[in-house]
């Protein structure tokens, strides 16, 4: 008699930190070599099947559950992940954009400009209709063939993982893909696999990690909300701009790591202890503000601009947060710094050779990020759990005056270290590593005042490493910024 297999469907609300990011997808592209494209796609498909078998939640779906109480529909709509033992395998399918892509050789020559990574390269939109009764996939993957290679495009639900989680997923996919080119005695299983049920236990894991490192802090809800008013707020206190109809665009700029290191040393010698990240943010923000204001006929009716930065809280919760296995969910909080427009404009007049004069802006950015401590995360998590509608909490929207700036960084996410094996290498016959040629974010033509620090390609210490920043602005401001001598003094020559 045949034995029947008991199939399970498991569901869970995503963690409170996940809920804040549950209305959109993260979309990334990896440009890879592929001398034999059919073979490369076959290897990638088998690798995808392997990693999704190990982590079945990647084959799961997201629904949005609206609580009802006393026969009334509450405003809260929370994301729920469901995963089943009989979920179908994911497929890696071909998806070509409307405009023909250049060859890999040409992409290398151009430096993989942002405008190549258009919206129709991806199988899912950025934004999700959370009022829809439909379920939404956790993960979808496609590839676009190009002469000499392919572009691997990944769409993952942001409520299920953040940028560091996607880096973990990509590394696992690369590892299982690489195995397809190895002999049985050469195959090594990944040593640090995430828990297969990881999304089901996140809220408990966060609490455990926080309790292991944080001092207890008890506050009422109003005190908590007041504390986080500059980062996450109940109401969007500043209405988003509706009057700016200027065309928006985006572009990648290559900054010099050596110049930033030199600047850090100069500032340290002057008693300003900051990071490379805060220096780069200060250089961009101050120059951008100067360029923005210089092109206006009327100054904005506010003396300050706000800098908002995404801060990865994982480092505060290590090592407990990564037990058992890497934590793939969201641990991203925000820090904000308000600096006067006069200070920003004055700082923006200083070029790379006058770095000591930018200390106030760099220090303000650094000090804001240092506020994200374990206790800060603990208090914020408890605040989220007390709020009826976590979706109403969000990053304070940028002012209507077009002077604010938002920055996020995945510079330390090791995408360029992901080795997909010789089938995805420049010399497949030579058994070389199949690491990405470029890692790119989609082209954005609707944001004004945003920056993403792209993953870094680590170089030997004697080389001047390139740090790529993807800047999104009104088109006329971006053109002026790209031609500005002060801003360009920070770029790699």
UniProtKB/Swiss-Prot annotation:
The entry's keywords: Acyltransferase, Transferase
Annotated EC: 2.3.1.-
GO MF terms listed in the record are: acyltransferase activity, transferring groups other than amino-acyl groups
- Copy the pathway line from the protein's UniProt record: Sesquiterpene biosynthesis; trichothecene biosynthesis
Induction notes from the record:
Expression is positively regulated by the TRI6 and TRI10 core trichothecenes biosynthesis gene cluster transcription factor.
Query: Its domain of life?
Result: Eukaryota
Quote the Pfam families the UniProt record gives. Transferase
Matching InterPro entries: CAT-like_dom_sf, Plant_Fungal_Acyltransferase
Region Disordered, residue ranges: 180-199
Residue ranges annotated as compositionally biased, kind Polar residues, are: 180-191
Q: What class of enzyme is it?
A: transferase
Acyltransferase is among the record's keywords: yes
General remark: Trichothecenes are sesquiterpenoid toxins that act by inhibiting protein biosynthesis.
Explain the purpose of this protein: The biosynthesis of trichothecenes begins with the cyclization of farnesyl diphosphate to trichodiene and is catalyzed by the trichodiene synthase TRI5. Trichodiene undergoes a series of oxygenations catalyzed by the cytochrome P450 monooxygenase TRI4.
Q: Report the protein name in the record.
A: Trichothecene 8-O-acetyltransferase
**Annotated source species:** Fusarium sporotrichioides
Question: What gene is this protein a product of?
Answer: TRI16
């Amino acid at each position: 008699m045949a034995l029947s297999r008991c199939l399970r469907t498991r569901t869970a609300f995503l963690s409170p930190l996940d809920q804040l990011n549950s209305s959109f997808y993260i979309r990334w592209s990896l440009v890879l070599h592929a001398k034999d494209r059919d073979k490369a796609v076959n290897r990638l498909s088998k690798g995808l099947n392997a990693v999704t078998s190990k982590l079945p939640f990647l084959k799961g779906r997201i629904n949005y559950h609206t609580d009802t109480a006393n026969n009334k529909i509450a405003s809260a709509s929370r994301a729920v992940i469901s995963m089943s033992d009989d979920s179908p395998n994911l497929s890696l399918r071909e998806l070509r954009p409307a405009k023909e892509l250049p060859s890999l050789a040409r992409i290398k020559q151009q430096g993989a400009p942002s405008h190549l990574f258009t919206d129709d390269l991806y199988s899912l939109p950025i934004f999700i209709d959370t009022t829809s009764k439909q379920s939404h996939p956790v993960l979808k993957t496609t590839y676009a063939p190009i002469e000499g290679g392919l572009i691997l495009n990944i769409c993952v639900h942001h409520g299920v993982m953040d940028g560091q989680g996607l880096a973990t997923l990509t590394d696992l996919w690369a590892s299982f893909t690489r195995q397809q080119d190895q002999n049985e005695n050469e195959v090594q299983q990944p040593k640090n696999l995430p828990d297969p049920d990881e999304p089901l236990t996140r809220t408990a894991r966060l609490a455990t990690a926080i309790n292991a490192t944080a001092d207890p802090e008890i506050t009422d809800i109003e005190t908590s909300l007041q504390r986080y008013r500059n980062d996450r707020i109940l109401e969007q206190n500043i209405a988003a701009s509706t009057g700016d109809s200027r065309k928006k665009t985006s572009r990648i700029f290559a900054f010099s790591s050596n110049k930033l290191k030199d600047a850090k040393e100069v500032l340290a010698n002057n008693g300003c202890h900051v990071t490379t990240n805060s220096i780069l943010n200060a250089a961009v923000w101050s120059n951008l503000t100067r360029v923005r204001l210089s092109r206006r006929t009327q100054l904005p009716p506010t003396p300050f601009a706000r800098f908002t930065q995404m801060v990865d809280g994982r480092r505060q919760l290590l090592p407990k947060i990564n037990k058992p296995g890497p934590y793939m969910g969201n641990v991203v909080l925000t820090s904000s710094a308000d600096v006067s427009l006069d200070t920003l404009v004055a700082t923006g007049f200083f070029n790379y050779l006058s770095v000591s004069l930018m200390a106030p802006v760099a220090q303000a950015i650094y000090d804001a990020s240092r506020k994200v401590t374990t206790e800060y995360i603990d208090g914020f998590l408890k605040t989220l759990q007390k709020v009826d509608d976590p979706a109403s909490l969000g990053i304070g929207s940028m002012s209507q005056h077009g002077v604010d700036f938002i920055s996020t960084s995945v510079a330390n996410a090791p995408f360029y270290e992901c080795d997909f094996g010789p089938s995805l290498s420049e010399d497949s016959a030579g058994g070389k590593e199949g690491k990405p040629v470029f890692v790119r974010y989609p082209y954005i033509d609707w944001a004004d005042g945003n920056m993403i620090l792209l993953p870094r390609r680590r170089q030997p210490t004697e080389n001047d490493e390139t740090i790529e920043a993807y800047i999104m602005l009104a088109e006329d401001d971006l053109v002026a910024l790209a031609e500005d001598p002060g801003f360009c003094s920070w770029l790699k020559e």
